[in-house]
C-alpha cells in the first residue's frame, strides 16, 4: 500500500524502493502490533472463556494449562496481514497467493477451535471434513498458480545436495504441491503442543525462506546457488519478515509459561503459508530439511499409529514425540529449547545445501 502511495501521490520516499528496508519495517511493525494488541486479545479470550481443551489421555502436566486461552493465531494473522498490505507491492501476485492460504487455512483452524471450545471436546472439526476443506483450498491454490502465472509454471523439482539438482516430474508436481500444503499445515499443528515449541521453528524456517526468496529473484545468484529463478520473488521476503515479526511478538506471550496458545487457527495458517511460499520458490524438498522438527513430529505420529495397528504395541510412550519426552520426565522448557536448537541446526544445514556441489 505504501508503494502505491509513494508512486501515485509522488511522496518520493526512496527508502520504500529498497526491499531490505521494507522487510525490516515489516518485521518491526508486525512485532510491535502483537506486543500492543496481544494483552487485549488475551483479556477478551479469557472473558469469552476460549480456554484450551486438554485431552484426558494427555500428559498429566498439561492439566495446569486448562485455564490458558487459545486462538491466539487470530492476532498472528492480523499482524501479518497488516504488515504485508502496508509494505508489500500488492500488484505482486505471489503475495495474494500466500494471503489466500493464510486466510483460508486460518478460517478452517478457527472453525476447528470454535467447535472444540463450544462442545468442550478436543476433537473439534471432524478429521474427514478438516482434510476435505484443506484439500479443496490446496487444489484451488495449485490450479491458480499453474493457470495464471507463467513464471512458476515449471514442474521441475529441486533436489538438495545434488550436482544436477533439477528434475522434471510433470504432473506429479501437482500432487507434491498438495502434500506440501496440507502436510506442512498439519505438521505445524501437531508440533504446537508445548509452550513456544512450534513458533520458534516457524520463525527459523521463515528466515531461511526469506533468504531464498532474495536469491531466487536474481538470475545470476540463483544460477550460482542452484536455486530456481523466480522473477519478482523478493516481495515474498517482506511477507516472510511479517511472519517472523508476528511470530516473535506472539512468542512474547507464548513462551513458558504460556499466557496464550495459537490454536489451530494459527498453526494451520502458518504451516499452510510456509508450504505455499516453498512451492512458489520451488523449494519443496528443502522445506523438509528446514522444517525437520515438524517432519519428525509427524512421522512419530504415523509410526505410532502403524505400530499400534499392526503390532498392538506403541513405539513411543505418547505421540507426538514431544509428549514422549514429557512422559519420560524431561522438563518442558528443556524439551522446547532443545527442539529449537535442532531446528536452528537444520536451517543451517539446509542453507549449506544451496552451494554444496
UniProtKB/Swiss-Prot annotation:
Instruction: Locate the transmembrane regions by residue number.
Output: 23-43, 70-90, 91-111, 127-147, 171-191, 196-216, 236-256, 260-280, 286-306, 334-354
Cofactor(s), names only, from the UniProt record: Mg(2+)
List the NCBIfam families hit by this protein, alphabetically. Answer: mraY
The highest taxon in the source lineage is Bacteria
Which Gene Ontology terms cover its molecular function?
Answer: metal ion binding; phospho-N-acetylmuramoyl-pentapeptide-transferase activity; UDP-N-acetylmuramoyl-L-alanyl-D-glutamyl-meso-2,6-diaminopimelyl-D-alanyl-D-alanine:undecaprenyl-phosphate transferase activity
Record's subcellular location: Cell inner membrane
**EC number(s) on file:** 2.7.8.13
Biological role: Catalyzes the initial step of the lipid cycle reactions in the biosynthesis of the cell wall peptidoglycan: transfers peptidoglycan precursor phospho-MurNAc-pentapeptide from UDP-MurNAc-pentapeptide onto the lipid carrier undecaprenyl phosphate, yielding undecaprenyl-pyrophosphoryl-MurNAc-pentapeptide, known as lipid I.
GO annotation, biological process:
cell division; cell wall organization; peptidoglycan biosynthetic process; regulation of cell shape
Q: Which UniProt keywords apply?
A: Cell cycle, Cell division, Cell inner membrane, Cell membrane, Cell shape, Cell wall biogenesis/degradation, Magnesium, Membrane, Metal-binding, Peptidoglycan synthesis, Transferase, Transmembrane, Transmembrane helix
What is the official name of this protein in its record? Answer: Phospho-N-acetylmuramoyl-pentapeptide-transferase
User: Cross-referenced InterPro entries, in alphabetical order?
Assistant: Glycosyl_transferase_4, PNAcMuramoyl-5peptid_Trfase, PNAcMuramoyl-5peptid_Trfase_CS
What does the record give as the reaction this protein catalyses?
Answer: UDP-N-acetyl-alpha-D-muramoyl-L-alanyl-gamma-D-glutamyl-meso-2,6-diaminopimeloyl-D-alanyl-D-alanine + di-trans,octa-cis-undecaprenyl phosphate = di-trans,octa-cis-undecaprenyl diphospho-N-acetyl-alpha-D-muramoyl-L-alanyl-D-glutamyl-meso-2,6-diaminopimeloyl-D-alanyl-D-alanine + UMP
Which leading EC class covers this enzyme?
transferase
Membrane topology according to the record: Multi-pass membrane protein
One GO cellular component term noted in the UniProt record for this chain:
plasma membrane
Task: Describe the family membership recorded for this protein in Swiss-Prot or TrEMBL.
Answer: Belongs to the glycosyltransferase 4 family. MraY subfamily.
Q: In which pathway does it act?
A: Cell wall biogenesis; peptidoglycan biosynthesis
